[in-house]
UniProtKB/Swiss-Prot annotation:
Annotated GO CC locations: cytoplasm; nucleus
Pfam families: ODC_AZ (PF02100)
Alphabetized InterPro entries for the sequence: Acyl_CoA_acyltransferase, ODC_AZ, ODC_AZ_sf
Function as written in the Swiss-Prot or TrEMBL entry: Ornithine decarboxylase (ODC) antizyme protein that negatively regulates ODC activity and intracellular polyamine biosynthesis and uptake in response to increased intracellular polyamine levels. Binds to ODC monomers, inhibiting the assembly of the functional ODC homodimer, and targets the monomers for ubiquitin-independent proteolytic destruction by the 26S proteasome.
Record protein name field: Ornithine decarboxylase antizyme
Record family assignment: Belongs to the ODC antizyme family.
């Protein structure tokens, strides 16, 4: 399991991402202290890793969790039950209002979009992306709490 890391300008909630993660063109100015307890951070990391060890997440805009999926969809090894558990954990335990799924815009296919729509996600208009997400290269779906 990867270690948690926290930057001074955004929260990196799991250790799978690198600072130069594709899709993050800047970092939000959200203060990271006291947004989530260490217990919540460790639980969130565990839930994300249960879904896929290839996924990573960032806290952006103070009340939004952005989950970055690997750009190579052939590496996805997903558990629907674990993903639903992740959503339930976020709704019940975290002070967030929405979850963003961030996918490589070039590789998005209708099957993936349909699967996430079935779970309650909807496409987010690029004008509504947080400033730290590259609207040119990333397709975002949103789940509102």
């Amino acid at each position: 399991m990867s270690k948690l890391a926290v930057s001074s300008s955004f929260s990196l909630l799991c250790g799978n991402c690198k600072r130069g993660h594709v899709g993050l063109e800047c970092y939000s100015d959200v203060p990271t202290n006291n947004l989530l307890s260490n217990e919540h951070l460790h639980s969130l990391e565990s839930f994300v890793n249960e879904v896929s060890s290839e996924w990573c997440c960032h806290l952006v805009d103070g009340n939004t969790l952005a989950i970055f999926l690997p750009f190579d969809q052939s590496t996805w090894n997903l558990s629907k039950g674990a993903f639903v558990s992740l959503l339930e954990f976020c709704e019940d335990n975290l002070p967030i209002k929405r979850i963003l799924l961030c996918l490589n815009k070039i590789n998005v296919d209708e099957t993936v979009v349909s699967c996430f729509k079935y779970l309650g996600f909807s496409p987010l208009h690029p004008h509504l992306y947080p400033s730290c997400i590259d609207s040119q290269g990333v397709f975002v779906m949103v789940y509102s709490m």
